[in-house]
Amino acid sequence: MIHSCRYRVRLVVGRRSFITARENHHNVDQAFLISTGAVALAEIGDKTQLLSLVLAARYRKPLPIILGVLVATLVNHAGAGALGAWLGTLVTPAIMRWALAVSFIGMGLWILVPDTLDEDEAKANRTRLGVFGATVVAFFLAEMGDKTQIATVALAARFHDFFGVVAGTTLGMMIANVPAIILGDRFAHRLPTKVVHGIAAVMFVVLGAMALFGVGF
């Protein structure tokens, strides 16, 4: 009888542990996938993508530029993710869902505003740090206060998953920027920028509406 009870207790505990593990895995996947998609969309036509085109056209060395973008993004988004995770401990999930929804809708409107490179980023392009160093400096500066950095803060605060969000936002940045680096400015003028921006803006508004109603968030 005692042996049977112990077996049942172990079975119940095992099932609960399995369910908890599955839920945690689902949350990690959700944070990673949503972060990847959101940032990849936000990066379309962004000043950092323009910067990738400028650096690729000037230096014509894709590999050190790609590595520079990766390092700058990891450092910048790690800080943003840490801030977001900390903010997430201060407010309720309902408030964070609303904040994320507003962020998505705001990014949808923001993405319609054309981005240009400012003087500080242009100066960073002319540093004597080499291709890799110039890319790290320029990209890090360009990301400060950018919509993808703000998105990282909001996503980390919403999902409470630092590594999943930072990995996702970094992958999203690379998905958007690596093709731009490889192609350089060779085909940039042929892209229907306004159409692409419009589609991305609509998708962000849809994501914002989904977040408001708790669909998938």
Language model regions located:
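Selected transmembrane alpha-helices and immediately adjacent juxtamembrane segments
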Residues: 121-149, 155
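Juxtamembrane transmembrane-helix termini in multi-pass membrane transport proteins
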Residues: 27-92, 151-170
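Juxtamembrane boundary at the C-terminal end of a transmembrane helix
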Residues: 210-217
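Short, Lys/Arg-enriched N-terminal segments with co-localized hydrophobic residues
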Residues: 11-27
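Membrane helix-loop-helix hairpins that form the core translocation module of multi-pass transporters
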Residues: 30, 60-130, 182-190, 196-202, ...
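Hydrophobic/aromatic residues within the transmembrane alpha-helices of Major Facilitator Superfamily
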Residues: 40, 44, 74-75, 109, ...
